[in-house]
Structures are given as C-alpha cells and as structure tokens.
C-alpha cells in the first residue's frame, strides 16, 4: 500500500474512533466518580464527566489531589468517557 493510502486509512480510523460512542460497559470506572476539587486552594477550570446527564461539565479544581474524572478539555473528556459532543468544544 502506498504512503498516501496509509495516511488515508489512518485518517479514516481516527475519524471512526472519534465518532464511535463508548458504551457504559466500556467506560472507565473513574468516569462515574463525582468531581473532586482536591485539597489545594487553586481555582482551575476543569471538565468532568457527569454520568447522570451523560455530558462533560465544568467544575473548579484546587490543583492537587482529586480523582481521575478531571480533564483539561471537553474533547479529552468525551474521548475518555464517551459523552456526545454538544455546544462549543473547549
């Protein structure tokens, strides 16, 4: 296969992975954890997956501690926990 064909295949696989939803069974267990601000006193805007709404939502993180349901972007939250894309991405 030519290098152009390989690049096309890689692009299609990447697109497919972005569009394929993660089922609740495949979702990492930490996606079901409540957001934790942690023990420090920072005020960092972060994203967590909310299993009740099936959305990636904003919370404020203190900067240390907390749990793994803590993402810098909605895109990373969606990729990890499988929430559908809604509204403007971060």
UniProtKB/Swiss-Prot annotation:
Keywords: Blood coagulation cascade activating toxin, Disulfide bond, Hemostasis impairing toxin, Protease inhibitor, Pyrrolidone carboxylic acid, Secreted, Serine protease inhibitor, Signal, Toxin. It comes from the Eukaryota. Residues 73-79, 84-89 are annotated as: Putative heparin-binding motif. Pfam families: Kunitz_BPTI (PF00014). The record marks 41-42 as: Reactive bond for trypsin. One of its GO terms (cellular component) is extracellular region. The modification Pyrrolidone carboxylic acid is found at residue 25. SMART domains: KU (SM00131). Residues 1-24 form the signal peptide. Residues 31-81 form the BPTI/Kunitz inhibitor domain. Expressed by the venom gland. One of its GO terms (molecular function) is serine-type endopeptidase inhibitor activity. PANTHER family: KUNITZ-TYPE PROTEASE INHIBITOR-RELATED. Serine protease inhibitor. Inhibits activated protein C (APC) with an IC(50) of 3.5 nM in the presence of heparin (to which it strongly binds) and an IC(50) of 88.9 nM in its absence. Other targets are also significantly inhibited in presence of heparin: trypsin (PRSS1) (45%), coagulation FXIa (F11) (40%), and plasmin (PLG) (70%). In vivo, synergizes with RVV-X in promoting coagulation in mice and by extension in Russell's viper bite patients. This is Kunitz-type serine protease inhibitor DrKIn-I. It comes from Daboia russelii (Russel's viper).
């Amino acid at each position: 296969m030519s290098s152009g064909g390989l690049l096309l295949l890689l692009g299609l696989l990447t697109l497919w992975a972005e569009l394929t939803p993660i089922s609740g069974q495949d979702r990492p267990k930490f996606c079901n954890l409540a957001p934790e601000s942690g023990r420090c006193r920072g005020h960092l805007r972060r994203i967590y997956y909310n299993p009740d709404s099936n959305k990636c939502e904003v919370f404020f993180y203190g900067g240390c501690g907390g749990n793994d349901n803590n993402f810098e972007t909605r895109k990373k939250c969606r990729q990890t926990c499988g929430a559908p894309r809604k509204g403007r991405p971060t």
